[in-house]
Amino acid sequence: MSIEFDDSSRHNMNMTQLMQLGAFDRRSGDDFMVQDFKNGIRDCSGIPVNNRNLAFKAYDAVKQKCDSSIKVFNIQDITIKGATWQHHNCQSTGKWYSQLYDYQNTFIGKQEYNILFDCYSYLKYNLNG
């Protein structure tokens, strides 16, 4: 899997190439996480990668991926409810899945955790202010 960025200085770089720059932290399989979008991309040590244009393009790509992956939920309704994601590892399959709870910690839904780990960071930022 690769996400391409149309950046003048880093044209059409895929996720592996970006990871080699220290911008991404390898998780498992093809899952990656950008450490901190609010302050741009950070490397594994928490040091900002000084390319805000690249950071914003990465954010947009991840947001688009997240939106398409979780379209089963209405994001605006979830935001109003103050929902939070809780991640669990299914012991029987070894796969991660997400459970969505509202502000009263009432179960809303779950999905198998096979999307970009970035979705959690994006949702956590948007759902929790």
Swiss-Prot record:
GO CC list: cytosol; nucleus
Domain of life: Eukaryota
Compartment annotation: Cytoplasm, Cytosol; Nucleus
Keyword annotations of the record: Cytoplasm, Nucleus
Protein name: Uncharacterized protein C212.03
